[in-house]
Amino acid sequence: VGRTQQLTDRQIGATVSAMDTQDAQNIPSDFPRIISVDDHTVEPAHVWQDRLPKKYLDTGPRTVRAPLREMTFLGGRFKPVMGEPGDDGPVGDWWVYEDLHRPLTRLDTAVGYDRDEIKLEVITYEQMRPGSYDVTQRLADMDVNHVQSALCFPTFPRFCGQTFTEARDRDLALLCVRAYNDWMVEEWCGPAARGRLIPLTLIPLWDPHLAAEEVRRNAARGVRAVAFSEIPPYLGLPSVHGDEWDPFLAACDETGTVVSMHIGSSSRMPSTSEDAPPAVGSTITFANCCFSMVDWLMSGKFERFPNLKVMYAEGQIGWIPYILERADVVWEENRGWGGVADRVHRPPSESFAGHVYGCFFDDAFGLRNLDSIGVGNVLYETDYPHSDSTWPKSREVGEAQMGHLPADVVERIVRGNAIELLGLTADGLWEGSA
């Protein structure tokens, strides 16, 4: 009880701090209302229990409250072990699915906490900010943060649905993917969201033909973004260099669905060794985005699918100029032996300009080199409710970072590019299938 009360007191303090920030937000500001292309939802416990057939309720995703036996995060890998009832150890809420036991952690939902209080520890739903999982509370927290609209990546399914891709029962996994997408569209982004929450759906990654069907099913109800892996081979899946993904990519091309890749969507964060502390991986979180972008630029897919767009959530943007320079040099000087002469017929930087978007929330270097990236290729994010989030001061952070830029450039970065890419209304709202 003491632990729960302590956390509740902290939440109250965070709310008071947020109210102070809200008062500051009421001061007139020329900074545009933010459209964040990378926030996160923590799925409520009922998502799959309400939507799966009854025969799967005891095997599909469900939550239990249990103690933590041990948890490590080294070498880019997260390894929690759930204890038995009565065991010593901090108690948290866990998702259980087949053999998987995955706890809710403070890193999943850290907003409202001082940096030194954010640790790798298990928590319960009561110990997180309600805006993590509740639509009405989320909109209130967005108001505090000068955010109008937000695209949200998943938590329990992981950033591109790896949880279901790794499952043994593929029939159940497909039902889980569809149930998540139905919840995302009908509830999370439903009427209560008033167009301010933008749907991002999952696909059955193990079957590109089923993936194409799911893209089209969701596009028919207005969805324009789908989660995908930065580096599919890390998940035991084909790379983008072959033709295995073409049915899925064709569906995205035809429907205007953006392929959205979040750091960590390869189920491993960049690191250097098994014993490297988390700080090493945290410093180089962009690395898989970098590798992935080169894959796409050298794959020829943007020429084969001319309407295809991809975006990198939380990858930041400062690394992009040199990679484009290097890719152009390799294409110009080495394409004969480099294996791309027959598929890439223009400089990679030209393909980037028409097809790739970088996303950032804290990248002063990238903003100083915006001319080498392209104003039209940059999107803004707040990463609520993760530990890196700029909530509740995303406006102030943005003003500090972009104060040197013309107002029309700031407008494009903070709103305009997202409106165009995601097919939002001129006011920055999601219309659904209307």
Which sequence ranges carry the predicted segments?
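Surface-exposed, active-site-proximal loop segments in enzymatic domains
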Residues: 117-126, 158-172, 209
